[in-house]
């Protein structure tokens, strides 16, 4: 009987603990750069690092432009956030979606397709994201206007 109570308690505890596989509505309150934002959800401020992408650093060519594009797209808007884990800087890694009456925008993908971010090097084999990046390259969108662009991971390594 004691074992049964313990098992029931354990199962309930697991379901009551917050998880990093969360999906929630939030308002974007600050854009830090082209791949990091602050959102507010239920009076909590949460720092989100957009999954799958790596935007130019602010001091890099196109860094400010990338931030401005993201700002225009999502600042002060209500969004859906899907998070799955945290990075080494304790930021929530997540997907951000804007749902309007007639469309849904996957913000992470929009940053790649518009030429405002690279596919993060871990996800280079994702065919959907690769097609978006190739579209931006072929059409010389955003950072692909120039041929000598430096990927953010190379820029950070060489600083």
What residues fall within each predicted segment?
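Small beta-barrel nucleic-acid-binding modules, primarily SNase/OB-fold domains
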Residues: 2-10, 15-159
């Amino acid at each position: 009987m004691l074992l049964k109570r313990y098992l029931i308690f354990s199962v309930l505890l697991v379901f009551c603990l917050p998880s990093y596989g969360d999906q929630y509505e939030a308002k974007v309150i600050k854009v830090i750069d082209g791949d990091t934002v602050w959102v507010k959800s239920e009076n909590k401020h949460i720092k989100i690092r957009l999954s799958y992408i790596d935007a130019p650093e602010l001091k890099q060519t196109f860094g400010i432009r990338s931030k401005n594009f993201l700002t225009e797209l999502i600042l002060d808007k209500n969004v859906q956030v899907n998070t799955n884990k945290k990075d080494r800087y304790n930021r929530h890694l997540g997907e951000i979606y804007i749902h309007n009456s007639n469309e849904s925008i996957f913000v992470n993908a929009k940053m790649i397709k518009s030429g405002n971010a690279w596919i993060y090097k871990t996800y280079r084999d994702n065919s959907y994201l690769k097609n978006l990046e190739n579209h931006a390259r072929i059409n010389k969108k955003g950072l692909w206007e120039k041929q000598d662009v430096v990927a953010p991971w190379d820029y950070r390594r060489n600083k």
